[in-house]
Amino acid sequence: MKNNTIRNVVATGIGAALFVVIGMINIPTPVPNTSIQLQYPLQALFSVIFGPIVGFLMGFIGHAIKDAMSGGGLWWFWIAGSGVFGLLVGFFRKFFRVEEGKFEVKDIIRFNLIQFGANAIAWLIGPIGDVIVSGEPVNKVIAQSIVAILVNSATVAVIGTVLLTAYARTRTRAGSLKKD
């Protein structure tokens, strides 16, 4: 897909706004300050469609605004984690053929392996930063990290797969149009 700066700027703005709005829906987990987040499947979709820069900025800007609006302060390492998730998924966008109208079983498996790896890397950033900079207890942040990796991976696996499958179906497959 051709790089289109205006398109990417608009996608970043819309993506960050949706990240904030959807991020206001918090489904609590038993671990303090950790919840099931529904914005990451959408971030994965945007990362695959628009690439790593849009994916990073959507997560970074959206998470920063969400934290600022919540009144609990800005947790920069966790904000960075959101950006890194979008960046990593976006780096692998060329492995997917959603723009060609294809998101088949092998694509779904590949997507979910990539998003799980991206979640694992992204949600180690926050805890490491919390321990080193903020002096947070190691046991607490390890629990938060494990829960974040698992629940975010699960939501992206289910909802992200549905979103990418639906998006691929809106694209015209190459060679699918025939002259009558």
Curated annotation (Swiss-Prot):
InterPro entries: ECF_substrate-spec-like, UPF0397
Pfam families documented for this protein: ECF-ribofla_trS
Membrane topology designation: Multi-pass membrane protein
Keywords per UniProt: Cell membrane, Membrane, Transmembrane, Transmembrane helix
Gene Ontology cellular-component annotations: plasma membrane
Membrane spanning residue stretches: 9-29, 45-65, 72-92, 113-133, 146-166
Gene3D superfamilies referenced in this protein's UniProt entry, alphabetically: 1.10.1760.20
Organism of derivation: Streptococcus sanguinis (strain SK36)
Location of this chain's protein in the cell: Cell membrane
Protein name in the entry: UPF0397 protein SSA_0592
Source organism phylogeny: Bacteria, Bacillati, Bacillota, Bacilli, Lactobacillales
